[in-house]
Amino acid sequence: MRPLIVIGNWKMNGNLASNQDWVKTVARGMESGMPAGRKFAVCPSFPYLSQCSTLIKEHSLAFLSLGAQDVSAHGAGAYTGEVGASMLKEMGCEYVIVGHSERRQMHQEADESVAAKALQALDSGMTPVICVGETADERNSGRAEEIVCSQVAKQVSVLQDRLADCLIAYEPVWAIGTGKVASAQVAQDMHRAIRMQLAEFDEDVASHVGILYGGSVKPDNAVELFAMPDIDGGLVGGASLNPQDFLAICQA
C-alpha cells in the first residue's frame, strides 16, 4: 500500500523568526500523533535548510522530514550559484523537488535537465519529487494527457527502474498560485493516466510510485482529493506557509 505523503513547498518565503514559529506550531499540532501510514515534509529556501533541520531535531519531529526546492544537475565543480545533492543530503534533506513548473517556465528547464537532477538526488540517497503538468492552453486544446504523459515518458527513458524510488507530482500549471483547483475527479483522471504511462514500462513500478497532486491544495479540498485511488498526497504551496493549514491538510 502506498503511503499518503504531504510535502510543503514554501517557495521564496519565510525568515528566521517565522520559520521558528512555524516549526513550533507544527510541533504542538503533531504532539497528539498523526494519522498512521502517512509521511510529511517541508521544503524551505536553501538559506533556511540548516535552521529548519536544527528545529526539527530540537522538537523531536519524527513525523516531519526536510526537503529542498531544487538541486543541481551536476555533482560538484565550477557551477556558480548551484547547490549539489550531496550538500543537501548533508543538511538533512530527504526529499528534493525537481522540475517544478516555475523552474520550467522561469529558467527554461527541460525534461532532460529534470531527469539529470533526479539522478543526482537518487545518487545522494534522497527522494526526488518529479513535477509534471500542463498549461491552460494545453488543457483547453485537449492535449493535457498527451503533454503530461510525454513528460513522464521522458523521465522513464532516463531513470528506468530507479523511478521506483521517486515521487511524481502532478501540478496543473493553470492551478498553481491562482486559487483555481482541478476537481478531485479531473485530478484523479490525470493521476490514473500517469500511472498507466508508468505501467507501460513496469507494472510493479507503477503500482508503487506515489503520485502527489500539486495545484492549490487547501484544507477545504484535501479530503476529497486524498480520497481518490491514484492520488497519494499533495505538494502544497501557499497553504503550507500557514502552519495550521498545513496541519489540517496533513490530517485530511
From Swiss-Prot:
Question: Where the protein is mainly located, per its record?
Answer: cytoplasm
**InterPro entries associated with the record:** Aldolase_TIM, TIM_sf, TrioseP_Isoase_bac/euk, Triosephosphate_isomerase, Triosephosphate_isomerase_AS
Report which superkingdom the organism of origin falls in.
Bacteria
Say yes or no: keyword Isomerase present: yes
Among the GO molecular function terms of this UniProt record, one is:
triose-phosphate isomerase activity
Q: Where is the active site?
A: 100, 171
Q: What is its EC number?
A: 5.3.1.1
PROSITE patterns assigned to the protein according to its UniProt record, in alphabetical order = TIM_1 (PS00171), TIM_2 (PS51440)
Q: What CDD domains does the record tag this protein with?
A: TIM
> What does the annotation say about its assembly with partners?
Homodimer.
> NCBIfam families recorded for this chain?
tim
Function field:
Involved in the gluconeogenesis. Catalyzes stereospecifically the conversion of dihydroxyacetone phosphate (DHAP) to D-glyceraldehyde-3-phosphate (G3P).
PANTHER family hit by this protein:
TRIOSEPHOSPHATE ISOMERASE
Name it.
Triosephosphate isomerase
Originating species: Polynucleobacter asymbioticus (strain DSM 18221 / CIP 109841 / QLW-P1DMWA-1)
